[in-house]
Amino acid sequence: MKEIIAKLADFKDLSSAEMTDVIERIVTGRVTESQIVAFLLGLKMKGETIEERTALAQVMRGHAKQIPTTIRTAMDNCGTGGDKSFSFNISTTAAFVLAGGGIKMAKHGNRSISSKSGSADVLEALGINLDLDAASLGKVFEQTGIVFLFAKNMHPAMKYIMPARLSLGIPTIMNLTGPLIHPMSLETQLLGTSRPDMLESTAEVLKNMGRKRAVVVSGPDGLDEAGLHGRTQYALLADGQISLHSFLPSDIGMEEISLEVIRGGNAKENAEILLSVLQNQASPYLETTVLNAGLGFYANGKSDSIEEGIALARQVIASGVAYEKLKQLQEYQK
């Protein structure tokens, strides 16, 4: 590890083989916490390359628990988190809309890091069991077309890295990695990041991880979702090619909404917001969910444009199908 840390201190990139070897040693308990701290900090100061991020994701995914399922078209829409926007649980709410629209949603998430309520927190408040075993989770997915995979349980190897992350207390390559190490072989993905400078490189990593189609999105003011309070930027992976795009609310036929009016609260409060959206109660929360679900339909290829995706999201919510998906998950993942 000393040689690797020294190399990072000299701002030199690691090869894929070097990164793979280091991560294998870390996740099998052969590296000290202080060395992991130095390693994560060194990568952050140097800047993480596509090769380093891909190698990390591949090793971590290889150590994840496997979910038995015959479904081969799964999608996820989680973000990196850590944007300090204190918004409600946007992607979690949107996941039920996407599932209601016929997409097989394997929602991967964790407890809160920088907000008051992460996806695991809000779903737990809604009665979802975070601790089912892998076989049971596979059955839930087969029966309902939606499942929540609690990252802490899916990635036992994280226990070797978490103390170092907590002692650092700042975003590292691990924050960028969470959405990339889904236990299932995802076909499509909507991934949010608070770093617009990493849109294209993250899309490259998704391509390396085998995604057929994906959108990596960064909202205004570093929101790790699409937002209605300014310009949203995104990278589209389609047909093996990556392209960069952006839009204002007016470009997609939506009204501008300030960030302040989509603030969330604790898990119980965010659960109430989620329910209100799925019950089609008009609010800034509903509009923000419609936008992100619409982008999700576009990322999946279910719609040919973001505008078409938004229209589909409104239809799915108004029909009650999205709310029905929540009730199904509450019934089967309990």
UniProtKB/Swiss-Prot annotation:
Pathway: Amino-acid biosynthesis; L-tryptophan biosynthesis; L-tryptophan from chorismate: step 2/5. Anthranilate 1 binds at G79, N110. This is Anthranilate phosphoribosyltransferase. It is an enzyme of class 2 (transferase). Coiled coil: none annotated. Mg(2+) 1 binds at S91, E225. Its EC number is 2.4.2.18. Transmembrane segments: none annotated. GO terms for cellular component: cytosol. Catalyzes the transfer of the phosphoribosyl group of 5-phosphorylribose-1-pyrophosphate (PRPP) to anthranilate to yield N-(5'-phosphoribosyl)-anthranilate (PRA). Its cofactor is Mg(2+). It comes from the Bacteria. Homodimer.
